[in-house]
A protein has these predicted regions:
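N-terminal amphipathic/basic leader segments beginning at the initiator methionine
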Residues: 1-19
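Glycine-rich, mobile lid/loop segments that gate access to catalytic sites or pores
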Residues: 5, 60, 65-180
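Short, ordered loop/turn segments at secondary-structure junctions
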Residues: 6, 29, 45-47, 82-84
């Protein structure tokens, strides 16, 4: 789970595949209708793709549960899934996982590394980076992690990537940076 104590600008790039997993539809809606998000719940093992209305309902349930334990609106919770296509999520395990993770949320190098490892499927090693630098007289940090970089056709198909920053940036500029 990725969480910010304050609402963050949200932007996204999504697969162009005709078949889109429920979390893609959920997150695309958040990016379209909101300037901010505050959490991302990620599961690895089952993609929640080709799961129909039940898959969409599971996105809602996941967001509702995260919102409840984190004290934020469900509309500020993105959901991401990776893994086997066509299987339903074990929603009871997802809910229990959200409950278990919330009090253990942490920041720093070790927490970032653990999160990057947790989203791996067929990856051979975690992919993460964080850089701190000065811009306009202020120190800012940009961090990122991803999985599935070997299977990205068509355009982001099975790849999950997350970028975080404390940089004050407009939604439009953030979206442009992700779309280059």
């Amino acid at each position: 789970m990725i969480y910010s104590q304050v609402p963050c600008r949200v932007a996204g790039t999504f697969t162009t595949n005709l078949v889109k997993a429920a979390p893609v539809l959920w997150d695309r809606d958040i990016v379209k209708n909101s300037d901010y998000a505050q959490a991302v719940v990620v599961n690895a093992g089952i993609a929640n793709a080709c799961t129909g209305q039940e898959g969409l309902d599971y996105c809602q349930k996941t967001a509702d549960q995260a919102a409840k334990v984190l004290g934020i609106p469900a509309s500020a919770v993105c959901v991401a899934s990776t893994g086997v296509i066509g299987k339903q999520l074990p929603i009871d395990r997802i809910m229990a996982g959200v409950d278990a993770l919330a009090p253990k949320l942490a920041d720093g190098v070790e927490a970032g590394n653990a999160a990057a490892k947790a989203i791996m499927t067929t990856d051979t090693h975690e992919k993460e980076v964080a850089v701190t630098f000065e811009i306009g007289g202020k120190t800012v940090t940009i961090g990122g992690m991803c999985k599935g970089s070997g299977m990205i056709h068509p355009n982001m198909c099975t790849m999950l990537a997350f970028v975080t920053t404390d940089l004050a940036i407009s939604k439009e500029l953030l979206q442009e940076a992700l779309s280059v």
